[in-house]
Amino acid sequence: MDSFQVYRDIKARTDGEIYLGVVGPVRTGKSTFIKRFADLLILPNLTDVHKKERTKDELPQSASGTTIMTTEPKFVPKEAVSVKLGEDVEVKIRLVDCVGYMVEGASGHIENGTERQVKTPWFEYEIPFTKAAAIGTQKVIHDHATIGLVVTTDGSVTELARENYIPAEEKTV
């Protein structure tokens, strides 16, 4: 089966709308991947200037270092965009970003010596940031993604050691 038959099959099974779930540990470059994917495949397919600017504004932030940047699952762009995968295969794509599973040494989830408590749409009460991140990541993997893409790292993109990522990668896979 050549690759375009695979794409045609996915299009038929999903009614032409693909949700690409980008998952993995925190601080691996998930949001950076989404921004780059959008730069190469989504933004060039938008002809309406206003829609293109809105879509740029919807892209996630990214940065170097150990601080967790993403704080909740996010669908990017807000509205699916048509992308040609071959001469005769066109699908509508949205990416789904998530916080990811916690990695030892990452920062941003602890404040004044205790784990931050956050409000989520899943509970009526506050829960620990790490728990919310895990639930959101699971929801992206199990409930939203048509295709899942696991992002890992060798540790060179942050100041975190490679071995710190392994438990979170195992949870993801």
Where are the regions that the model predicts?
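Conserved G1/Walker A P-loop phosphate-binding module
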Residues: 1-129, 139-151
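Conserved catalytic-core segment of NTP-binding enzymes
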Residues: 131-173
